[in-house]
């Protein structure tokens, strides 16, 4: 018989730098999970992606064991890195903060494809372009 799920927790944590401090401690502590065990497992799983924020979905079972699935970094983080900007524009329609080539948009879409609900790469690219526009990042050909 499969284990009974008592909770699912979604967090966005820096790769390789999860600690028992908030937000990890309070989120997992209420389910009685061994927080250090999760931190060690998460840090080992994300060791190669230093400097990125990695979303993680943790499934907690009745016997206080857990499993987790890491996702790809948020599109906004990947776009900020590609454009070389610290943050998006406060007024995206008026003030542009950076430029990204369409080829880079395609790379990001290919990376995010498994997490997006898009059927093909073109649809995924349009989603990423929409995110870029809402951040005030201009898309240039190339």
UniProtKB/Swiss-Prot annotation:
Top-level taxon in the UniProt lineage: Bacteria
Entry keywords, A to Z: Methylation, Ribonucleoprotein, Ribosomal protein, RNA-binding, rRNA-binding
GO-annotated biological processes: translation
Disulfide bond annotation, renumbered to this chain: none
InterPro entries: Ribosomal_uL11, Ribosomal_uL11_bac-typ, Ribosomal_uL11_C, Ribosomal_uL11_C_sf, Ribosomal_uL11_CS, Ribosomal_uL11_N, Ribosomal_uL11_N_sf
PROSITE patterns: RIBOSOMAL_L11 (PS00359)
UniProt-recorded Gene Ontology molecular function terms: large ribosomal subunit rRNA binding; structural constituent of ribosome
Post-translational modification: One or more lysine residues are methylated.
Cellular component annotations (GO), alphabetically ordered: cytosolic large ribosomal subunit
Subunit annotation: Part of the ribosomal stalk of the 50S ribosomal subunit. Interacts with L10 and the large rRNA to form the base of the stalk. L10 forms an elongated spine to which L12 dimers bind in a sequential fashion forming a multimeric L10(L12)X complex.
Record's function text: Forms part of the ribosomal stalk which helps the ribosome interact with GTP-bound translation factors.
Family affiliation: Belongs to the universal ribosomal protein uL11 family.
Name under which the protein is recorded: Large ribosomal subunit protein uL11
Source organism (scientific name): Dictyoglomus turgidum (strain DSM 6724 / Z-1310)
Highest classification ranks of the organism: Bacteria, Pseudomonadati, Dictyoglomota, Dictyoglomia, Dictyoglomales
Gene that this sequence comes from: rplK
């Amino acid at each position: 018989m499969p284990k009974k799920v008592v909770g699912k927790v979604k967090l966005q944590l820096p790769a390789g730098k999860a600690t028992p401090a908030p937000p990890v401690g309070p989120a997992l502590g209420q389910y009685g999970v061994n927080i250090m065990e999760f931190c060690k497992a998460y840090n080992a799983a994300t060791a190669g992606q230093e400097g990125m924020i990695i979303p993680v979905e943790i499934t907690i079972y009745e016997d206080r064991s857990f499993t987790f699935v890491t996702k790809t970094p948020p599109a906004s983080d990947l776009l900020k890195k590609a454009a070389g900007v610290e943050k998006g524009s406060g007024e995206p329609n008026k003030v542009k903060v950076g430029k990204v080539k369409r080829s880079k948009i395609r790379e990001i879409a290919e990376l995010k494809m498994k997490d997006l609900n898009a059927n093909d790469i073109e649809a995924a690219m349009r989603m990423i372009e929409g995110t870029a526009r809402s951040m005030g990042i201009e898309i240039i050909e190339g």
